[in-house]
Amino acid sequence: MTNYDTLDMDTVKLLNTHYTKGRDGGSIQFIVLHHNASNLTVEGCWQVWQSRQASAHIQIEENGRTGQLVWDADTAWHAGNWYANTHSVGIEHADKLVNDQWVLSEATLDAGAHVVAAYCKYYKLGKPEWMKNVFPHSHFSATACPASIQGSQNAEYMSRAQ
């Protein structure tokens, strides 16, 4: 992220499909975390979402590089729940399978946590708190997403988001 105060990501590669312009009267009230179940780059996410009816606002790569895919003023299709989509920012994280478990790299975990903190500050959501203003995708849809972010790496992730 190039500027935490203004939420400027390292790169911008905006989707031209599979999101909704505006927020249908909603405003950003919380953050929804996701994992790629793959080691995708910003460009890789962009490519996948050209044919898959899904999107997210932000992608965090394995090396910590951040990318904006949908503007915050618009609705990404990420939570499987329209209210959640129109009232949140969706943040995707690259990860890898290690011993049959999806795991974030150190750089992804650190960058993701700092992006969450920056979003909470910018949108005046309060201190990042799990299940208060930071939610797993699985809270809104039947899914194991965001894997380790809601499991083995949750405490470290949320600690770094402070």
What are these regions (language model features)?
Residues M1-G25, K96-Q162:
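Basic/polar, cationic surfaces and motifs that engage anionic cell-wall
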Residues M1-N85, C145:
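N-terminal catalytic cores of peptidoglycan-degrading enzymes
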Residues N36, A94-K96:
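Short strand-loop junctions, especially beta-strand C-caps/beta-turns
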